């Protein structure tokens, strides 16, 4: 099924390359709708892995150990899907190397490319380093793919010196990846904020986008954990405490997200600048009111009602809230992109009009989600989704703490 969706998306992209960008609606006043929406959305959920995992590592949260790898894998595959949207809206993707050879430093797009490239390489490294001990374990126990695991394990023998070097490398990457991750979505927001388009030209977009990215990333991680828990029988590792703690973190981010959303719209309303008020009105009570209030319901009302109470902050409850958040955050990206572009700021510009996605955009959107799921499934088949050596290390630490506590009590 996933391969069929991906194949159809590839067929539609080939059709776009043959017929030109006109089949993607690029001759309409409002365009790049789904491509740009999906770009921002996937870059956002990529924060599920490296950023959340790095913060939990640095704070030495013991409950993080079983979930870090599942989170870090989301980052890598989400980044691949996000950057693919750059190819979709190029009429000549084979010439993409030209801007790399002749970059324009004043263009926010070049900084986008630079930040995302560094983030992708850093995320792959951050995913790979903790995999090495488990790859060595697979090398010794899996005859079918031993050649692959032998090559990837880099001669790991588990000596104290190797463990010390690995811990130092992981610690360095955990510190380095946090500012990189924050810079990525900040620079993504500047693609909008550096323009004079109504309700894009805003100084609040940087932190607003970062908060939204972490928010949607946590939701994506919770859904992935629930599916993996059921599909691969990982109940002993993905326990209710993990869903409870991540649910509380998601509730905190929901409140932060509402604060930034309110601050953005309040300043526009109070400023009473005609072009921006036209966009604001379209969101609150006009053409975009339905997706806007659906977004508010999905991103705040539903998580607040479910995650505020321990009785409903269960595995099922957190998954329902996470699904609502992902829907709401996709709608938020859609509203940001489309509502502002639908209202011209000058009489010399187009006469506006509502955006309507083309078939090729819908097909490529479905193909991206299918490809993301397929890559994640393949990764789960080839590599352990739970860091075996880290879980064992955590169990050993817990046992030593219990023995120390017992000895002190006897004294």
Language-model features, listed with the residues they occupy:
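Membrane helical hairpin/interfacial module
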Residues: 32-94
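N-terminal signal-anchor module of multipass membrane proteins
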Residues: 1-48, 373, 377, 390, ...
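TerminUS-proximal long segments
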Residues: 299-303, 313-411
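Long, contiguous internal "core" modules enriched in hydrophobic/ aromatic residues
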Residues: 1-13, 61-63, 101-295, 306-307, ...
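Transmembrane alpha-helix boundary signature
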Residues: 14-15, 86-98, 128, 132
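Hydrophobic alpha-helical transmembrane segments
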Residues: 39-47, 111-125, 289-300, 357-375
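Membrane-interfacial helical/loop segments at transmembrane boundaries in membrane proteins
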Residues: 95-103, 275-279, 340-354
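Interfacial and helix-entry/exit segments of alpha-helical transmembrane bundles
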Residues: 70-76, 235-258, 317-328, 394-396, ...
């Amino acid at each position: 099924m996933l391969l069929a969706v991906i194949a159809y998306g590839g067929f539609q992209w080939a059709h776009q390359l043959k017929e030109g960008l006109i089949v993607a609606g690029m001759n309409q006043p409002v365009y790049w709708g789904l491509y740009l929406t999906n770009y921002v959305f996937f870059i956002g959920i990529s924060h599920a892995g490296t950023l959340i995992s790095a913060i939990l590592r640095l704070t030495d949260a013991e409950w993080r150990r079983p979930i870090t790898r599942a989170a870090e894998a989301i980052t890598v595959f989400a980044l691949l899907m996000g950057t693919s949207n750059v190819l979709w809206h190029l009429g000549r993707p084979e010439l993409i190397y030209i801007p790399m050879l002749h970059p324009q430093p004043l263009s926010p797009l070049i900084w986008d490319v630079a930040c995302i490239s560094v983030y992708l390489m850093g995320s792959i490294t951050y995913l790979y380093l903790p995999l090495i001990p488990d790859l060595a374990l697979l090398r010794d126990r899996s005859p079918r793919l031993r050649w692959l695991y032998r090559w990837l394990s880099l001669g790991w023998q588990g000596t104290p010196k190797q463990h010390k070097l690995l811990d130092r490398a992981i610690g360095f990457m955990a510190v380095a990846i946090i500012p990189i991750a924050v810079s990525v979505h900040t620079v993504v927001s500047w693609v909008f904020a550096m323009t004079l388009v109504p309700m894009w030209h805003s100084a609040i977009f940087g932190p607003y986008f970062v908060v939204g990215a972490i928010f949607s990333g946590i939701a994506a991680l919770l859904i992935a954990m629930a599916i993996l828990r059921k599909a691969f029988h990982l109940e002993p590792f993905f326990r209710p405490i993990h869903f409870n703690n991540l649910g509380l973190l998601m509730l905190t981010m929901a409140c932060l997200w509402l604060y930034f959303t309110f601050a953005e719209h309040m300043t526009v309303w109070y400023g009473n600048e005609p072009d921006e008020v036209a966009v604001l009105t379209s969101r609150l009570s006009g053409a975009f009111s339905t997706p806007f209030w659906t977004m508010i319901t999905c991103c705040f009302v539903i998580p607040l009602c479910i995650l505020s109470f321990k009785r409903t902050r269960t595995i099922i409850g957190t998954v329902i809230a996470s699904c609502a958040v992902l829907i709401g955050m996709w709608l938020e990206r859609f509203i940001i992109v489309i509502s502002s572009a639908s209202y011209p700021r000058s009489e010399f510009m187009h006469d506006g009009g509502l955006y309507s996605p083309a078939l090729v955009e819908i097909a490529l959107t479905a193909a991206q989600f299918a490809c993301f799921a397929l890559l994640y499934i393949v990764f789960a088949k080839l590599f352990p989704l739970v860091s075996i050596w880290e879980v064992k290390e955590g169990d050993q630490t817990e046992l030593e703490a219990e023995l120390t506590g017992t000895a002190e009590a006897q004294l």
